[in-house]
Structures are given as C-alpha cells and as structure tokens.
C-alpha cells in the first residue's frame, strides 16, 4: 500500500481536476503534512500506552475509509476525493511506527531480533514491486484503490488475529508453575537460545 500510494498519489490527485502536473504535485503536500502529524501522534500514543495492535487497526480503518471513498464516490466530487486522499496517506503512513515497533518489541534476543527485523523489512520492500503495478487504470484508478483497500483490510484482520494470539499466549505463560517454566527453558535450549519464548517474557499487544 505504502509504495503504491507514494508512487501514484500525484496521478490520483491530477485525475481529480484540470490541474497541471506541477499543481498536482503541490496538492500532494497537505496530505503528507497531515500524515507527518499523525505519524508523530500515533508513535507517541503507542509508546505512552505501550500498545501497538489497536493503533494499527485505527490507522487501517482510516485508510480503508479513504480507499472506499475513492472507489465509490464519483470523480466529479473533487473535495470528497481530495479528503479521501488525505485519509489514505494519513492511515498508510501513520501505521508504520507502530508496525515497526511491534515486531521489534516481540522478538527477544539480539540475533532473533536482528534476523526478524531484516526479514520483515525486506519482505515489506517487495511491496514496491507490486505497488507500481496495481495502479494501471487511470484516471479513476478504481482497480488499484480496490486492491489497496483489500490489502488494508487483510492487514487489519491479520493484526487482530495476531493480537488475540499473543494475548492468549501471555495469559498461558502467566499461569505456568515454576516446574513448567523450567521445562519450557529446557525445551528451547536454555537462557542463551530461548529469547522471546522465555516463560517470563510478555508479548507487547
């Protein structure tokens, strides 16, 4: 989503009215200013409450609403489309800090965290390949926005499922006896290898 929106926002904005390319580029500035403010706000709130999942869900809902407006509202309603573009950029970009913090928080041990971070970021960057291919049906880009909306909805669903599973695992660990904790340590190779699988480790939700 992030790559597709970044690459094609000027084209999407240009398709809303009779603007030159330079004007369309300038009109992309306010959405990014709003996204900057939202990104800082979401990051601070996420750290303050030490919570990631619901912050990501909130951002996904905002971006989904924006994509739906772009798909369903006629292109002639320029103000609505521009508002929708702002929602999309805010939702997609403000999602990033909570997302990055979430997976780094939940991998214990330097090696596991380093490998996981590199792998997840690399997989995320593959999105740049697909992001440049989905916006092929200008000037309305209904197919591209529909695909991006589906991706946002899929991410929202995945976040809710993962948050539920991590919460359930935290509860399971809280109920372990000392003997069961010792067995878990042995199962994963002792303190040097266990990382976030340690029975006293609690996943960030």
Where are these regions (language model features)?
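C-terminal ends and interior cores of transmembrane alpha-helices
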Residues: 58-76
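Helix-loop junctions at membrane interfaces in 12-TM secondary transporters
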Residues: 71-85, 95, 165-166
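A late C-terminal transmembrane helix in Major Facilitator Superfamily
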Residues: 107-141, 145-151
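Extracytoplasmic gate region of multi-pass secondary transporters
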Residues: 1-46, 53-54, 96-101, 127-132
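Cytoplasmic membrane-interface "Motif A"-like loop-to-helix N-cap segments
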Residues: 47-61, 111
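Small-residue-rich packing faces within the transmembrane alpha-helices of Major Facilitator Superfamily
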Residues: 36, 64-65, 125, 129, ...
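Intracellular terminal tails of multi-pass secondary transporters
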Residues: 141-205
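Intracellular juxtamembrane helix-capping segments at the cytosolic ends
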Residues: 92-109
């Amino acid at each position: 989503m992030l790559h597709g929106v970044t690459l094609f926002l000027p084209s999407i904005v240009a398709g809303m009215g009779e603007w030159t390319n330079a004007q369309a580029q300038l009109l992309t500035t306010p959405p990014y200013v709003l996204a900057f403010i939202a990104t800082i706000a979401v990051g601070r709130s996420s750290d303050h409450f030490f919570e990631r999942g619901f912050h990501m869900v909130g951002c996904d809902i905002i971006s989904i609403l924006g994509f739906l407006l772009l798909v369903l509202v006629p292109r002639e309603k320029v103000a609505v489309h521009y508002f929708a573009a702002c929602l999309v950029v805010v939702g997609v970009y403000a999602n990033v800090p909570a997302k990055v913090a979430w997976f780094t928080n939940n991998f214990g041990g330097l090696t596991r965290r380093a490998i996981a971070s590199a792998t997840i970021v690399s997989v995320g960057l593959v999105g740049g390949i697909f992001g440049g291919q989905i916006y092929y049906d200008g000037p309305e880009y209904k197919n591209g926005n529909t695909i991006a909306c589906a991706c946002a909805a899929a991410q929202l669903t995945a976040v809710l499922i993962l948050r539920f599973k991590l919460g359930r695992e935290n509860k399971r660990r809280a109920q372990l006896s000392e003997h069961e904790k010792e067995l878990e340590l042995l199962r994963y190779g002792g303190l040097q290898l266990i990382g976030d699988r340690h029975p006293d480790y609690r996943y960030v939700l």
